[in-house]
Amino acid sequence: MAKSGLRQDPQSTAAATVLKRAVELDSESRYPQALVCYQEGIDLLLQVLKGTKDNTKRCNLREKISKYMDRAENIKKYLDQEKEDGKYHKQIKIEENATGFSYESLFREYLNETVTEVWIEDPYIRHTHQLYNFLRFCEMLIKRPCKVKTIHLLTSLDEGIEQVQQSRGLQEIEESLRSHGVLLEVQYSSSIHDREIRFNNGWMIKIGRGLDYFKKPQSRFSLGYCDFDLRPCHETTVDIFHKKHTKNI
């Protein structure tokens, strides 16, 4: 296992801090997070190398960069194999009142240009604020580099007069998506309980509260009303898996 042993001079302090964290995560077998830190630390070391004139220091830096790159590559191969075997699992715990968990912040890592189809299973896309949550999720998909063409939604049907509002809201979202070249297919189930989101690049995300994990804003003019990275969250758990194939709803 790689060790951070980087000399603490002003130029390399940032790199040393990130790489120290990478080694800690590595030792705890938190490989996805460790890989991110290794990659960031390597980029910082490369910047230090560009500004270093002393040949001895340059040689030492190249050696350290090579060592960290080897470790990062080994972790990447391990994670890729986990994905191939369908064993990959990452868990994120969102604490009560935590911020920084907008849909873009949570999902962007898993949305690349290969994503063309999305499946959402969530029994609670019914009330007005839940319809807005689904709309924000769709907006996020449209803005990402992926080329989503079809969105499948499986949810439960509201009761009474609220059913009209739910159907009308989803119809308006469907029409709006169609104007952007995206097909929305909605199905209803009275027995749905699970909440999960799947992309056709193999990623599957299960959120304990589904899309409805944001708290109500304190007022219409409080921070977080518009920017959901600033919106406090309810406590929930996010489980992320990777499978070679996703199933249809």
Curated annotation (Swiss-Prot):
Its main location: membrane. The keyword Signal does not apply. Transmembrane segments: none annotated. Residues 168-231 are annotated as: Important for association with membranes. Keywords: Cell cycle, Cell division, Endosome, Membrane, Transport. SMART domains: MIT (SM00745). GO terms for cellular component: extracellular exosome; intracellular membrane-bounded organelle; late endosome membrane; membrane; midbody. Homodimer. Interacts (via MIT domain) with CHMP1A, CHMP1B, CHMP2A and IST1. The C-terminal domain interacts with lipid membranes containing acidic phosphoinositides and is required for location at the midbody. This is MIT domain-containing protein 1. It comes from Homo sapiens (Human).
